[in-house]
Amino acid sequence: MIKSFGNKETEKIWDGIQSKKLPADIQNVARRKLRMINNSQNINDLRIPPANHLEKLSGNLIGYYNIRINKQWRIIFKWENDNALDVEIVDYH
């Protein structure tokens, strides 16, 4: 379950509100991926579908995971006690 968001724009997408700061063409896919995160019982649930490309991050994002929206955009989040924290849509490039 999603417990917190990393920024207001991601929370807007979750709430079904269009964001002017994020590309319109990713918003529906991002909302669907946010629902997947919210409905996950554990982190391994996000390995399916394989198109999510679930990854554990390193470097300055150690402790975070990400799934892909598309080639450019990702949803990053922390996973603790079967909950997603600091969920945020980011431009990965």
Task: Give residue spans per PLM region.
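Catalytic-pocket segment enriched in acidic/His residues
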Residues: 77
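Basic, Lys/Arg-enriched alpha-helical interface segments
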Residues: 1-69, 80-93
